[in-house]
Amino acid sequence: MKIGRLRVDPSLFEVRFAAGCDTRRCAAACCRGGVWLDTAERDRVVAHAELVQRVMDPGQPRDPRHWFSRRVVADADFPSGRAAHTRVRGGRCVFLDGARRCVLQKASLAAGNGLQLKPYFCTAFPITIDHGALMLDDEDYRDGQPCCGATRGGPLTVFDVCRKELRHVLGRLGLSRLRRMAVRNRRNRAPC
């Protein structure tokens, strides 16, 4: 099954979540190891360093040279084909403030002009793209999060919990197509 260039991983139809799961209450548990972002996103953040610095906590590093690792990797899942990683400080992404809020998101909101500094895959989490497959982030979500995670027999579907994130990745039409796939999948699995 495909939507555009993306293969749809069956986990999107099979994984269930616990009652009460809501990605808006996550307290940034997913940010603990930093994040991969397109090199163009990294460059945009550095170009707006002054805006980012204004919303940082006093203990966060102000020097943009300390925000990203120097290593750049080839990765076809990113628009430019190249990805960089945020640095990790104190066990979490360097852009996470003391209240566990993303300063890139805060800076974007402070700009008030539609500027998007928060990386694409941060906004999409727990949905990710891995080797051209649309899927749940294995490392973080399948093993469970302190705030919310996949569970056997849970009452909520990926669509219940991740609709906003799926729309971010697929767009409105892509989400509608994925929903139809899920309905067909449910019918095919229904006991006779």
What residue spans do the PLM features occupy?
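Short loop/turn segments that flank or connect secondary-structure elements
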Residues: 1-92, 96-192
